[in-house]
Amino acid sequence: MADPSPEIKAVARYIRMSPYKVRRVLNQIRGRTYADALILLEFMPYAACEPVRKVLRSAVANAEHNNGLDPRDLVISKAYADQGPTLKRFRPRAQGRAYPIRKRTCHITIAVRPIEPEAATAS
């Protein structure tokens, strides 16, 4: 039997931003509806909001196009940022030394699902 509420996801890979900074934004939108999350992302003062907004719009577009779901009925079920490969650079310092610079990347994953009808009537 098919799952009545499928999860539709979108992934952005190799985003040139630290996963710690992206997780700070994802923790705020997890569990919220699509409309609430868009409003939050628009007014939060973090640079990580732009790539997260793009992935969220992509996940909702996937739900609309592939599953025929209404964006107003979608809630963010999963949102996480995994660490990607680190670009290693070196900063020259005095007396022949060099300090390492780690340019971190991350993979952002957002999954949306329709709001459960029994959960909406119970509250």
From Swiss-Prot:
GO cellular component, one term: cytosolic large ribosomal subunit
Keywords of this entry: Ribonucleoprotein, Ribosomal protein, RNA-binding, rRNA-binding
A Pfam family reported for this protein in Swiss-Prot or TrEMBL: Ribosomal_L22
Kinase listed as a keyword: no
InterPro entries: Ribosomal_uL22 (IPR001063), Ribosomal_uL22_bac/chlpt-type (IPR005727), Ribosomal_uL22_bac/org-type (IPR047867), Ribosomal_uL22_CS (IPR018260), Ribosomal_uL22_sf (IPR036394)
Record flagged with keyword Transferase: no
GO BP term, pick one: translation
GO function terms (MF aspect): rRNA binding; structural constituent of ribosome
NCBIfam families: rplV_bact
Function noted in UniProt: This protein binds specifically to 23S rRNA; its binding is stimulated by other ribosomal proteins, e.g. L4, L17, and L20. It is important during the early stages of 50S assembly. It makes multiple contacts with different domains of the 23S rRNA in the assembled 50S subunit and ribosome. The globular domain of the protein is located near the polypeptide exit tunnel on the outside of the subunit, while an extended beta-hairpin is found that lines the wall of the exit tunnel in the center of the 70S ribosome.
Assembly with partners or alone: Part of the 50S ribosomal subunit.
Family designation: Belongs to the universal ribosomal protein uL22 family.
The protein, known as: Large ribosomal subunit protein uL22
Species for this entry: Synechococcus sp. (strain JA-3-3Ab) (Cyanobacteria bacterium Yellowstone A-Prime)
